[in-house]
UniProtKB/Swiss-Prot annotation:
Keywords: Plastid. Its main location: plastid. It is found in: Plastid. Belongs to the roaA family. This is Ribosomal operon-associated A protein. GO terms for cellular component: plastid. The lineage of its organism: Eukaryota, Discoba, Euglenozoa, Euglenida, Spirocuta. The keyword Plastid applies. It comes from Euglena longa (Euglenophycean alga).
Length: 519
């Protein structure tokens, strides 16, 4: 009865009419109050505030909003306003769909497909817990875990880790602990006692088979549990800045200057982990030499080369990316070619947003483009077994500016779409990065293949003209991104010029999200 009432109530609400500025201000006020209480160590009041924040509709609204904006699969109109409100109403309750994965059937222009409702709920719930736990954990812990903050850029993570390696270059030995596996079997009594969060709630969501607890929430708990480890080792072993450890995603990396130094610290390390509920059985084979073995951090493999670092993209990540593309074409192509190309284009865009600064772009991009083209050719040949190669090539490939591109026309809407090749992203992008005070600090210029001379020329030519344009563009576009039409909340954005015109500089300039590209 209650669910029927909520569903009927949600029909009368419109997601686009929510005043997000008011919602963000209320959550910021909650965070500020928790932050002050954390400084005064008033844990009872902190738990009350966290409980109110967790149950608040404002927090749930923002959690669902961020899950839609930050995830490609849910960016479109697949999720209606009614469904968003339905998730908001039930977000903080224990529901059966934690264990029963059921699906929604959506129909768009005679196209029937499914998306995983449980997966979207998981994204929303992760954001909800982050908003509740963040103010306390940010103040009370050592921020050694990369990706700890909400809006950490992947390239910033890479640069920070590289600085740590350069600063501690003489610490040649290291070993890793896979915390993700250890967490499932750890004793969580210490966590229940010390973490300022509802105990019954934690017990329910930290069960072994409860997959809702993952991703960013794990980083927060991770960061909290290892708080004080460095000072503990230094105090027990009388070591000054000789013990270094960092973490990312699933692993903790411990660095030591020598093998003897490691033997001194390992017993205290095991004692510290056992006190926090983690049973760790050390094996000598876990210790590796950075000079001979290198180190894999996230998707990047670091190698020592004299006094410099060489790094490359992990081959496993490349193969996994190819596997996802292959699965996408295999499962969706026959049903709807147009929709499949849309998914592939977004897959390519999202992958390049992560990896284009870390890879040998020229040859890898060509390899990936050839791989995708071969897959499409094989599927089309099976789809048109009686047609000749010339007929297939003339139907699905067109020559534009000397480049042959795969294209398809939607028979219903009449829209035409081209397959985005990785090599198409070789053009440079200009965007402004703002600091926390709201003023512009400097201009980034990504020009992947032009010379430094031309890059410097572009910077000197445009830097004085881009700065005053931001406010005009923001007002003209009503604070919305030119591509996705969503509001620009982040302090990272980019300003691009589609076609250069020597006479009128302000023509064809648009304000975009940092992660948005033209499809």
């Amino acid at each position: 009865m209650f669910s029927n009432y909520l569903l009927s109530f949600s029909y009368r609400l419109n997601w686009d009419f929510i005043k997000w500025n008011l919602v963000d201000n209320i959550i910021s006020l909650f965070h500020h109050e928790i932050h002050i209480l954390s400084k005064n160590l008033n844990f009872r009041s902190i738990k009350k505030k966290q409980h109110l924040l967790f149950k608040s509709f404002y927090t749930r609204f923002v959690s669902v909003r961020d899950s839609v904006d930050n995830n490609f699969f849910f960016k479109s109109n697949i999720i209606s306003s009614k469904e968003k409100f339905f998730i908001v109403f039930f977000l903080c309750y224990k529901r059966n769909f934690f264990y029963n994965l059921f699906f929604y059937n959506i129909e768009i222009i005679n196209l029937s497909f499914k998306f995983n409702f449980f997966l979207f709920y998981k994204f929303c719930f992760n954001n909800l817990v982050k908003f509740v736990m963040y103010p306390f954990l940010e103040l009370k812990t050592e921020n050694f875990v990369f990706n700890f903050n909400f809006y950490t850029n992947l390239y910033d993570i890479f640069l920070n880790f590289k600085k740590i390696l350069l600063k501690n270059f003489m610490k040649l030995y290291y070993f890793t602990i896979n915390f993700n596996n250890k967490f499932n079997y750890m004793n969580k009594k210490w966590l229940y006692k010390n973490l300022t969060f509802n105990i019954n709630f934690l017990k329910y969501f930290l069960k072994l088979n409860n997959f809702i607890f993952n991703g960013s929430i794990l980083f927060f708990i991770f960061n909290f549990m290892f708080n004080g480890l460095k000072s503990f080792i230094q105090r027990k072993c009388f070591m000054n800045n000789e013990f270094i450890y960092v973490s990312s995603l699933k692993n903790i990396y411990f660095f030591f200057k020598s093998y003897n130094e490691f033997n001194i610290c390992i017993n205290y390390l095991i004692y510290f982990l056992k006190y926090k509920g983690i049973n760790f059985n050390f094996i000598n084979d876990h210790v590796k030499n950075f000079l001979t073995n290198g180190l894999t951090f996230n998707f990047i493999k670091f190698f020592n080369f004299g006094y410099k670092f060489l790094f490359k993209l992990n081959e496993k990540d490349i193969n996994y990316y190819k596997f996802n593309i292959k699965t996408l074409i295999k499962n969706f192509y026959i049903k709807n070619i147009f929709y499949t190309i849309c998914l592939i284009n977004n897959k390519i865009k999202n992958w390049l947003d992560k990896y284009f600064l870390f890879v040998n772009k020229k040859y890898l991009f060509l390899e990936l483009d050839i791989f995708i083209s071969k897959l499409l050719w094989i599927k089309i040949k099976k789809y048109h077994p009686k047609k000749s190669n010339i007929w297939i090539y003339s139907k699905y490939w067109k020559n534009f500016s000397g480049i042959w591109k795969f294209f398809i026309i939607n028979n219903i809407s009449g829209k035409m779409i081209f397959l985005k090749y990785h090599y198409d992203f070789n053009n440079y992008l200009l965007y402004l990065k703002s600091n926390y005070s709201g003023t512009f600090s400097y201009l980034y210029t990504f020009n992947l293949y032009n010379s430094n001379k031309k890059k410097n020329f572009l910077f000197e030519k445009f830097k004085y003209k881009f700065f005053p344009k931001f406010l005009d563009l923001y007002i003209t576009q009503k604070g919305q991104c030119y591509i996705c039409k969503k509001h620009i909340y982040s302090k990272k954005f980019k300003i691009i010029k589609l076609k250069f015109d020597n006479n009128k500089f302000s023509k064809n300039i648009y304000l975009l999200h940092f992660y948005c590209n033209f499809i």
